């Protein structure tokens, strides 16, 4: 939770692999997460901050292996 000039500002950071999420996909993520915080936690959508970081698959590992290599195997 961020506080700016006494106003609580929920902050959500979404990290996804950089594999073709469109602007429309990202708009849906931002809208959906904002609405979820409003519905579940009664947070004000006007002060909710959502950021999306797209990480190259060469910079993301799962189970000791780069996502790039996992994708080559269809995992």
Name these PLM-found stretches.
Residues 25-53:
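Amphipathic, hydrophobic secondary-structure cores in small proteins
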Residues 1-8:
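Short, Lys/Arg-enriched N-terminal segments with co-localized hydrophobic residues
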Residues 8-23, 27:
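N-terminal acidic leader/helix
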Residues 20, 42, 61-64:
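Glycine-centered flexibility sites
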Residues 18-20, 70-75:
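Short, surface-exposed, charge-dense and proline/glycine-enriched linear segments
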Residues 11, 22, 39, 66-67:
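General helical secondary-structure elements
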